[in-house]
């Protein structure tokens, strides 16, 4: 009997020893973006049992690249700026989790920063795997001028990353690319506002020696922020298939974030003080505010807003007010707690549609194409959505100026929003997650 009990105890001990804690994941956003881009993907990882305290997201101070990497430009960052901030986030993740290595997941420019970190900043010693999503590894264009540009495939930076082996010994690497809809991997760049002959191909994001996967029909951002991309990165990182492909809701998520703004025309992730942040619950099936603001505070020098406890079945309006200008973000019900709900104070602008009801329909995690993405307003297809190659992440829709608002839908996501009649004083944003 004792021998049998001992055998059972040993078997349990062996199984327990085999259950290793996963390496923490650091998510790395792209050009002009911020850490909030990863809210959906992080929610999917958590919903599949990945420990929430081992999921990190870097927030680059000045996320937009310089025109010339070695020439200082206000509100923009160099490749060294980027890799320095990534290195600091990795160091923090290792210290807090006591892990030996991390996994890095990067979108677009974030993938280039990951490669720079692995190759030139000692990152290969502390990284077990890397996933590069829509990263222009061979350039957005490859031309003979502007060789100090970060995105030039013939330039100094990318040639340095690609010479010799395109992957790094000891680090498992996967790339995700589109078959033909990535705006930054186009032989003809005119639709994206680039050269007619870019010198790059649809295969540009792939790397020799990596596991290269194609997501057919995906646009540039969907290669990082879509459920399809999640399933691929989850299997690559964990070695098993994800069970949940939708975010599992908490009853009362706790939400907070940072108010950010602009430096000239460049979006930054620097905190903005003196912004009044109000969070209003909306009546079900309407964009009408239901009662007083659930949260009402003015940001201090830290720019931090929240935390606020929400109901995951209720839609909310997140209103920013500063210097007589309002920005209202209408979002679908927030399913899980996050400290990454950063809200950008978009500057006031002249409004050519003043006097009519209109909304800014925004899709930060993807792009729009009328032939592919059926955006409906009150059940009818909108005529304002851009068509063709998906290159735009927002568009202005003219809608009825109703007090109760209109219903906007895309890919199963529904958001009620109250239109604006003058964007110069109040910008109304439908902020889609997927």
Locate predicted features:
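Sec-dependent N-terminal signal peptides
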Residues: 3-14
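Catalytic histidine-centered segment of alpha/beta-hydrolase-like enzymes
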Residues: 218-226
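The serine-hydrolase catalytic nucleophile loop
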Residues: 35-41
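Serine-dependent carboxylesterase/thioesterase catalytic core
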Residues: 25-31, 42-46, 51, 57-167
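Hydrophobic beta-strand segments
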Residues: 265, 270-282
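Preference for solvent-exposed, low-hydrophobicity sequence contexts
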Residues: 263-265, 283-296, 300-434
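Short beta-strand/loop motif that positions the catalytic acidic residue
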Residues: 175-177
């Amino acid at each position: 009997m004792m021998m049998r009990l001992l055998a059972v105890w040993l078997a349990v001990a062996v199984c327990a020893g085999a259950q290793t804690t996963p390496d923490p994941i650091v998510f790395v956003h792209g050009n002009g973006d911020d850490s909030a881009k990863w809210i959906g993907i992080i929610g999917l990882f958590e919903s599949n049992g990945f420990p929430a305290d081992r999921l990190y997201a870097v927030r680059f101070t000045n996320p937009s690249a310089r025109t010339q990497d070695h020439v200082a430009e206000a509100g923009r960052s160099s490749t060294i700026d980027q890799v320095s901030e990534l290195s600091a986030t990795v160091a923090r993740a290792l210290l807090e989790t006591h892990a030996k290595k991390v996994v890095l997941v990067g979108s677009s420019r974030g993938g280039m920063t990951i490669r720079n970190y692995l190759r030139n900043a000692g990152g290969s010693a502390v990284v077990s795997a890397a996933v590069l999503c829509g990263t222009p590894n061979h350039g957005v264009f490859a031309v003979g001028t502007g060789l100090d540009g970060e995105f030039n495939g013939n330039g100094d930076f990318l040639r340095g990353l690609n010479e010799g082996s395109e992957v790094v010994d000891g680090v498992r690497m996967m790339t995700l690319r589109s078959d033909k809809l990535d705006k930054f991997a186009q032989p003809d760049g005119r639709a994206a506002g680039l050269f007619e002959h870019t010198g790059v191909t649809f295969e540009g994001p792939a790397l020799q020696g990596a596991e290269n996967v194609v997501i057919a029909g995906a646009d540039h951002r969907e290669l990082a922020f879509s459920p399809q991309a999640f399933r691929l990165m989850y299997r690559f990182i964990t070695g098993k298939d994800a069970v949940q492909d939708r975010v599992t809701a908490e009853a009362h998520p706790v939400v907070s974030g940072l108010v950010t703004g602009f430096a000239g025309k460049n979006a930054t992730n620097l905190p903005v003080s003196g912004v009044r942040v109000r969070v209003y619950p909306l009546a079900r099936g309407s964009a009408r505010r239901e009662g007083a603001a659930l949260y009402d505070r003015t940001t201090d020098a830290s720019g931090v807003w929240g935390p606020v406890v929400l109901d995951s079945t209720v839609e909310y309006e997140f209103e920013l007010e500063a210097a007589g200008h309002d920005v209202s973000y209408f979002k679908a019900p927030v399913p899980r707690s996050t400290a990454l709900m950063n809200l950008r104070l978009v500057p006031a602008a002249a409004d050519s549609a003043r006097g009519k009801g209109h909304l800014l329909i925004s899709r930060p995690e993807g792009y729009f194409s009328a032939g592919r993405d059926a955006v409906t307003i009150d059940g009818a297809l909108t005529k304002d959505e851009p068509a063709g190659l998906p290159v735009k992440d927002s568009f202005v829709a003219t809608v009825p100026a109703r007090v109760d608002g209109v219903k906007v839908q895309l890919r199963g996501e529904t958001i009620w929003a109250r239109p604006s009649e003058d964007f110069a004083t109040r910008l109304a944003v439908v902020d889609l997650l997927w």
